[in-house]
Amino acid sequence: MAEEQPQVELFVKAGSDGAKIGNCPFSQRLFMVLWLKGVTFNVTTVDTKRRTETVHKLCPGGQLPFLLYGTEVHTDTNKIEEFLEAVLCPPRYPKLAALNPESNTAGVDIFAKFSAYIKNSNPALNDNLEKGLLKALKILDNYLTSPLPEEVDETSAEDEGISQRKFLDGNELTLADCNLLPKLHIVQVVCKKNRGFTIPEVFRGVHRYLSNAYAREEFASTCPDDEEIELAYEQVAKALK
């Protein structure tokens, strides 16, 4: 008889109305991991302005997101991800770790470059900061268009050309995607709203990647509303003046 699965509940930051999902890439990352694992779970949004006594009892520190697994409370996004990968494992649940270590660091600089770009109010610095973001996006694009080792046929004399894989580490979503995609979504929404900047079409690998990601329910359905992201960055994003 199959072992009964403990109750799994993910507590995430609520949006502006105190109920819907708010802007938090870490919350979305874990939401995606649980969905991809195929485990039965509940998501509870926590209004950071009005935390309930239950939430205070479960997690006195109040750091979001946090996970309730049976009676165990787990905090720290990286540790929660490691825990889920260890306990929700094959044969019952899929392994989500990337096969290629490089997939875990692809696009690693994008969010920092985006933050510097969006927080700047000095027009004289804008071009250089935008170039920094573009350079980070270019590095990701290069990774997405370069064939992975398993895509290369060593017996063929032909050039393997451009990778057509859907995601960072192949044709299935992995933990690497769960980490990067929520951040890329924020970059797109905030840059368009506050700088009129969109990811250049020349970055075909990035556009293919995002298009494939938005076609997946695990990503598209866990994204907060654009308005929630814009609201979260209202005080963070500076106008050029």
UniProtKB/Swiss-Prot annotation:
Please name the GO terms that the record assigns under molecular function.
chloride channel activity; oxidoreductase activity
Q: Name one Pfam family in it.
A: GST_C_2
What Gene3D superfamilies does this protein map onto?
1.20.1050.10, Glutaredoxin
The portions of this protein that span the membrane are 26-46
- In the record, which positions carry Phosphoserine? 121, 156, 211
Report the superkingdom from the record: Eukaryota
CDD domains named in the record: GST_C_CLIC1 (cd10300), GST_N_CLIC (cd03061)
- Which residue ranges does the UniProt annotation give for the motif G-site? 24-27
Record's keyword annotation contains Disulfide bond: yes
Which PROSITE patterns does this one have? GST_CTER (PS50405)
Q: List its EC numbers.
A: 1.8.-.-, 1.8.5.1
Give all residue intervals belonging to the GST C-terminal domain. 93-233
List the catalytic activities from the record: L-dehydroascorbate + 2 glutathione = glutathione disulfide + L-ascorbate; chloride(in) = chloride(out); iodide(out) = iodide(in); thiocyanate(in) = thiocyanate(out)
Coiled-coil residue windows: none
For the modification Phosphotyrosine, the affected residues are 233
Disulfide connectivity for this sequence is 24-59
Q: Does the keyword Ribosomal protein apply?
A: no
* Record localization: Nucleus; Nucleus membrane; Cytoplasm; Cell membrane
Q: Which residues carry this modification: N-acetylalanine?
A: 2
Keyword set, alphabetical order: Acetylation, Cell membrane, Chloride, Chloride channel, Cytoplasm, Disulfide bond, Endoplasmic reticulum, Ion channel, Ion transport, Membrane, Nucleus, Oxidoreductase, Phosphoprotein, Transmembrane, Transmembrane helix, Transport, Voltage-gated channel
Provide the assembly information: Monomer. Homodimer (in vitro). Interacts with TRAPPC2. Dimerization requires a conformation change that leads to the exposure of a large hydrophobic surface. In vivo, this may lead to membrane insertion.
In the record's own words, the domains note is: The active G-site contains a monothiol Cys-X-X-Ser motif which mediates glutathione-dependent redox catalysis. Members of this family may change from a globular, soluble state to a state where the N-terminal domain is inserted into the membrane and functions as a channel. The redox status of the active cysteine in Cys-X-X-Cys/Ser motif likely determines the capacity to adopt a soluble or membrane-inserted state. A conformation change of the N-terminal domain is thought to expose hydrophobic surfaces that trigger membrane insertion.
The record's comment on protein family reads: Belongs to the chloride channel CLIC family.
Protein's recorded name: Chloride intracellular channel protein 1
Which gene name belongs to this protein? CLIC1
